[in-house]
Amino acid sequence: MPTVKTTASTMKLAIGVGILATIFCLPVRAQTVSKLTLDQAGAQTVLQSARETAQRRNAPSAIAVVDPAGDLLAFQQMDRVRPASADLAIEKARTAARLQRPTAEIEDNINHGRTAFVTADIMALRGGAPIRVNGEVVGAVGVAGLSKETDTDIANTAAAALSPTGETHSMIDGVGVGAK
C-alpha cells in the first residue's frame, strides 16, 4: 500500500501543479484605468478666472496653467507686468503640479528648515496652486504679479474655477476635464 499512497500523493501534486499552470497561463485582460485630464477648455476657464480676479484687484499678473506633468496648456501676461513674472508664473504652476501641493506650503517648509525643497526645478515662491477634481490633480495654475499674498489668492481662486461649489475637491460634470 505505501506505493499506492505515494502514487496518490504524486497524482494530487501533479493535479495541483496543472491547475496552477492553467490559472497562470489564462489570458489576462487589461484593466482600463480612467484618468482625468485637463483639456484646453478647462485650462482657458482657469486662465479666465485668474485674469478676472487679477483685474478686479487691479493686480496685473502673468498666469500659467499646466497639466500634471507641468507642461504648459495656457498662458497670459497682462499689461504692465514685470518681465520676470512670465517665467515665475510658469515655474510656480509646474512646481504645484509636480509636487501636487500649493507652492505656499513649499515656501513654508523651506522657511521652517526643510532645505530638501531647495533643489533645481522647484519654485518655492507663493502663487502656485494644484487644480484638483475629485481629489485628483489634473493640473496647476501659477500666478506672478505684485505680491505673494495677491498671487496666492488669485491662484487659489483660479484653481477652484472648475468646481461649481468653489471647492477644488468637488465633483464636476466634465466641464474642462475629460477622462483619459
Predicted region positions:
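Flexible, solvent-exposed loop/hinge segments and secondary-structure transition points
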Residues: 30-180
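Bacterial N-terminal signal peptides
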Residues: 5, 12-27
